Design a protein with these regions (language model features):
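N-terminal active-site beta-alpha-beta segment that forms phosphate/nucleotide-binding
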Residues: 2-79, 83-88
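Conserved phosphate- and dinucleotide-binding cores of soluble alpha/beta proteins
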Residues: 82-201
Length: 201
C-alpha cells in the first residue's frame, strides 16, 4: 500500500509523519527517540505485536494497563499514563483525507490522545487506512470494535457474531467513547507513525 495521499493529508493538517517498512524498524526508531521519559500507552494490539513496551521500559518509566506492575491497579496505571510526558496509541481507523478515528470504553485512550502530553505518537498499520471518513468510521465500528470485544471476552452481539456493530445496550458494551481528530490538536506535538505492515485490529 502506498501512503502518499495519506502522508500529504496528514502533513497539511499539521502532523509530523514518519514512514517505516515494518514494525521492527518503527520500534527501533521509537526506542531511540524516547529515553528517560514518562510514557503512557493506550490499549493496543498493535503496540503488543510490535513488542514496543519491552523496547521502551528498560530506559523509560512506562505506564500501560496491558502490563500491570504488581503494586498498581489498572485504573491507577491508566491515570498515570494520561499524566505522562509522552503518549503512544494506535488508532481504529484513519481516512486518506486525514481524519483519525478511535472508539474507547473507559475513555482513557481518547482523552489522552486529545490532551495533556508534550507529544503524542499515533501508530498506524496499513490495514487501518480507508479511502474516506465514512469508510474509516465503518472500519472502526464494524471491524476493530468487534475484534476488540472478542479479545476482551465480553458477551456482546458483535463479539459473538463477529460481523458488525449492533449498537447494543449490553452492560458489557466496549464502544462508549468516540473521537475524531479532524486536524492536529493545538498544544502538543503529534507524530504519526505509518508502517507498511498489517498490525492490530
Amino acid at each position: 500500500m502506498e501512503f502518499t495521499k495519506l502522508k500529504t493529508s496528514l502533513e497539511c493538517l499539521g502532523y509530523t509523519v514518519s514512514e517505516f517498512n515494518d514494525a521492527e524498524e518503527a520500534t527501533k526508531y521509537l526506542a531511540n527517540q524516547l529515553s528517560d521519559r514518562t510514557i503512557g500507552i493506550g490499549g493496543s494490539v498493535t503496540v503488543e505485536e510490535m513488542k514496543l513496551y519491552d523496547a521502551l521500559v528498560s530506559h523509560n518509566d512506562v505506564y500501560w494497563h496491558m502490563r500491570l506492575p504488581e503494586n498498581m491497579s489498572a485504573m491507577e496505571v491508566r491515570k498515570r499514563a494520561n499524566q505522562s510526558e509522552f503518549y503512544i496509541s494506535s488508532v481504529n481507523g484513519i481516512a486518506e483525507t486525514g481524519e483519525i478515528i478511535n472508539i474507547d470504553n473507559t475513555g482513557n485512550r481518547v482523552s489522552a490522545i486529545s490532551f495533556g502530553h508534550d507529544k503524542v505518537y499515533l501508530i498506524i498499520g496499513e490495514n487501518k487506512v480507508a479511502s474516506s471518513y465514512e469508510e474509516a468510521l465503518g472500519r472502526a465500528r464494524n471491524i476493530a470494535a468487534p475484534l476488540n470485544a472478542k479479545r476482551l471476552g465480553v458477551k456482546t452481539p458483535c463479539a459473538i457474531k463477529g460481523d458488525k456493530c449492533y449498537d447494543c445496550k449490553s452492560p458489557q458494551r466496549i464502544c462508549r467513547n468516540f473521537s475524531v481528530l479532524w486536524e492536529k490538536p493545538t498544544g502538543s506535538e503529534y507524530e504519526v507513525i505509518l508502517i507498511h505492515e498489517k498490525l492490530g485490529y
